[in-house]
Swiss-Prot record:
<dbReference type="InterPro" id="IPR016185">
    <property type="entry name" value="PreATP-grasp_dom_sf"/>
</dbReference>
<dbReference type="GO" id="GO:0004363">
    <property type="term" value="F:glutathione synthase activity"/>
</dbReference>
<dbReference type="Pfam" id="PF02955">
    <property type="entry name" value="GSH-S_ATP"/>
</dbReference>
<dbReference type="GO" id="GO:0046872">
    <property type="term" value="F:metal ion binding"/>
</dbReference>
<dbReference type="GO" id="GO:0005737">
    <property type="term" value="C:cytoplasm"/>
</dbReference>
<dbReference type="GO" id="GO:0005524">
    <property type="term" value="F:ATP binding"/>
</dbReference>
<feature type="binding site">
    <location>
        <position position="275"/>
    </location>
    <ligand>
        <name>Mg(2+)</name>
    </ligand>
</feature>
<comment type="similarity">
    <text>Belongs to the prokaryotic GSH synthase family.</text>
</comment>
<comment type="pathway">
    <text>Sulfur metabolism; glutathione biosynthesis; glutathione from L-cysteine and L-glutamate: step 2/2.</text>
</comment>
<keyword id="KW-0460">Magnesium</keyword>
<feature type="binding site">
    <location>
        <position position="277"/>
    </location>
    <ligand>
        <name>Mg(2+)</name>
    </ligand>
</feature>
<dbReference type="InterPro" id="IPR004218">
    <property type="entry name" value="GSHS_ATP-bd"/>
</dbReference>
<feature type="domain" description="ATP-grasp">
    <location>
        <begin position="120"/>
        <end position="304"/>
    </location>
</feature>
<dbReference type="InterPro" id="IPR013815">
    <property type="entry name" value="ATP_grasp_subdomain_1"/>
</dbReference>
<protein>
    <recommendedName>
        <fullName>Glutathione synthetase</fullName>
        <ecNumber>6.3.2.3</ecNumber>
    </recommendedName>
</protein>
<dbReference type="Pfam" id="PF02951">
    <property type="entry name" value="GSH-S_N"/>
</dbReference>
<feature type="binding site">
    <location>
        <begin position="146"/>
        <end position="202"/>
    </location>
    <ligand>
        <name>ATP</name>
    </ligand>
</feature>
Length: 307
């Protein structure tokens, strides 16, 4: 197969930690031709999708050939693996990738789903599995929810890697001013969730491939921190899935398959769903290292069975 990876500039990739690098190397081991480009390299001339792409040999990291204009219709699979934020440039890239999709190319994850499934709001489809949650921009609503729950976590809807996530108590002085700040004076909604004390034991990143859980790691927060994201100092640990976690995965699977969300990372705290990550989920390297599971190879094998 010919596979194109749309991602951040290769110079920014840390291959020893990066899930996209792991997938590219697994595709190479499967005998596929690997190409890469950034979102700004995508082109549509009329209804013909193209890209100025680089032929790459990702293992060992990395040999890069000269850029070539390629018809996207000539690829079997295109991976959209650009990291958030989901800004204008990101959204326009998904529209250009839809042109390739109409030409018969399998795009992962499906561009329309990348737009529709905000990584915070998408979880609301499965609210029965979540802690009490409120999404609002009105400060009075958020304050009432904080008083009701006592201890809450506030998340920006466009955030990633734990950035901008804060924990507040209802009686905290200056709560109203803080809520005015995070909502930009009630211009933007934020997500408020009941704080789950189980987070001190870690939150679990579960990677689902075509709806099936193929790997997971526990991410334990560092001393004095409640955020467990690896990007803010969390430590990855080996883990196994509990029965409630398997039930969550089973509940999500039909919707993920129907929406074309082939590679997804969900976050679970104390048996409760926190987020559904669809843009460029991480954790492959940690699963492979801690669980001794060839997750990237399994992902490419599953993909080849579907294309």
């Amino acid at each position: 197969m010919r596979q194109l990876f749309v991602l951040d500039p290769l110079s920014q990739i840390r291959p020893e930690k990066d899930s996209t690098a792991a997938l590219m190397q697994a595709a190479q081991r499967a005998g596929d031709d690997i190409w890469s480009c950034t979102p700004s390299d995508l082109i549509a001339r009329g209804d013909e999708p193209m890209a100025v792409a680089l032929p790459v040999t990702p293992d060992p990291w990395i040999a890069v050939g000269a850029p070539e204009r390629q018809s996207l219709a000539g690829f079997d699979v295109i991976w959209m693996r650009k990291d958030p934020p989901v800004d204008e440039a990101y959204l326009y890239a998904t529209h250009l990738l839809e042109v390739a999709e109409r030409a018969g190319v399998r795009v992962l994850n499906r561009p329309s789903a990348l737009r529709a499934w905000n990584e915070k709001l998408g979880a609301l489809r499965f609210s029965r599995w979540m802690a009490p949650t409120l999404v609002a921009g009105r400060v009075s609503e958020l304050m009432a929810f904080a008083r009701e729950q006592g201890d809450v976590v506030l998340k920006p809807l466009g955030g990633r890697a734990g950035l901008g996530v804060i924990r507040v108590q209802a009686e905290a002085p200056g709560l109203k001013a803080l809520l005015e700040l995070v909502t930009e004076q009630e211009r933007l909604p934020v997500m408020a969730q009941r704080f789950l004390p189980d987070v001190t034991e870690g939150d679990k990143r579960i990677l689902l491939v075509d709806g099936d859980p193929l790997g997971a790691v526990n991410r334990r927060p560092s001393e004095g921190e409640f955020r467990s994201n690896l990007a803010v100092g969390g430590q990855a640990e080996a883990t196994e899935l509990s029965e409630p976690e398997r039930q969550i995965c089973a509940a999500l699977a039909p919707a993920l398959r129907a929406e074309g969300l082939f590679f997804v990372g969900i976050d679970v705290i104390g048996g409760m769903l926190s987020e559904i990550n669809v843009t460029s989920p991480t954790g492959v390297r940690e699963v492979e290292r801690l669980m001794q599971e060839p997750l990237a190879d399994q992902t490419i094998e599953r993909l080849r069975s579907l294309v």
